[in-house]
Design a protein with these regions (language model features):
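Cyclic nucleotide-binding regulatory module and flanking cytosolic helices
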Residues: 1-33, 82-86
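Short, small/polar residue-rich loop motifs at catalytic or cofactor-binding pockets
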Residues: 23-24, 42-44
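Cyclic-nucleotide recognition modules
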Residues: 24, 68-126
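Glycine- and acidic-residue-biased ligand/ion/polar-headgroup-sensing regions
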Residues: 34, 45-58, 73-75
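Short phosphate-coordinating micro-motif centered on Lys-Gly-acidic
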Residues: 36-42
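A short beta-strand-loop-beta hairpin characteristic of the jelly-roll/cupin
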Residues: 55-67
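Inter-domain helical "communication" segments and dimerization helices
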Residues: 114, 118-125, 130, 134-144
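Phosphate-/nucleic-acid-contacting segments
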Residues: 151-154, 158-215
Length: 215
């Protein structure tokens, strides 16, 4: 992956990124599908960038019910909020949805100016603030999608956002049916029934993860 295309390293040249990775003591790790990357209750000092694959962010209540909070696509940053708060236990679990490669960087080295006084280190910190702002936006969007009392309302809210982002009424969603139900905080079987009704009503068409809105 070209790191200059990621949010965290946006605006930096390849040579600058290479220099920064040395200063940040960055390491790369691989995870197999289903493997836990970071666990709820753990404390982390590392920011992660997903280089390849896909990861899912979830949380479990005391009864064992799972809620999907979001996904991590290639180039995306995760765990930055917890890493920036010393001693803060994670409230979520990050798992590999498929075979995944991740770049980890120590947040202390990211926030502190290195001994080499890299002139581009300030840009990195600004980018990190932007990443944190985007994370808050994503959480706000999930609140919006789950605010409707009806399952159809939640589905349409989410599909509408996906269509706007894709710039098309036909798009792929990153979740399977169970993950989508968890993300929208609804029962999977009931949600699947509602999807079938929406298809019969001529509102949507779908084939696995591809959704087409009939507008």
């Amino acid at each position: 992956m070209n790191l200059s295309n990621t949010q965290l390293f946006r605006g930096l040249e390849e040579a600058e990124i290479t220099s920064l990775l040395g200063c940040l003591n960055a390491t790369t790790r691989s995870f197999q599908k289903g493997e836990v990357i970071l666990s709820e209750g753990n404390i982390t000092e590392n920011i992660g960038i997903l280089l390849s694959g896909l990861a899912v962010i979830s949380c479990n209540d005391i009864w064992g019910n799972t809620s999907i909070l979001g996904h991590v696509a290639p180039g995306s940053v995760f765990a930055e909020v917890y890493a920036c708060i010393p001693g803060e236990s994670m409230l979520v679990t990050v798992s590999a949805a498929e075979d995944t490669s991740i770049l980890f960087m120590n947040v202390g080295r990211v926030l502190a100016t290195c001994t080499n006084a890299c002139p581009f280190h300030t840009r990195l910190v600004r980018n990190l603030l932007t990443v944190c702002a985007h994370r808050n936006l994503q959480l706000s969007q999930r609140i919006q999608h789950t605010s409707s009392k009806s399952i159809r309302g939640r589905l349409m809210s989410y599909f509408s956002e996906c269509a706007k982002r894709a710039g098309s009424n036909s798009f792929l969603i990153p979740y399977n049916r169970q993950q989508l139900a968890d993300y929208l905080n609804v029962d999977r079987s009931t949600m699947c029934n509602e999807l079938s009704k929406m298809k019969r009503d001529g509102i949507i068409e779908y084939d696995k993860n591809r959704i087409s809105l009939k507008v």
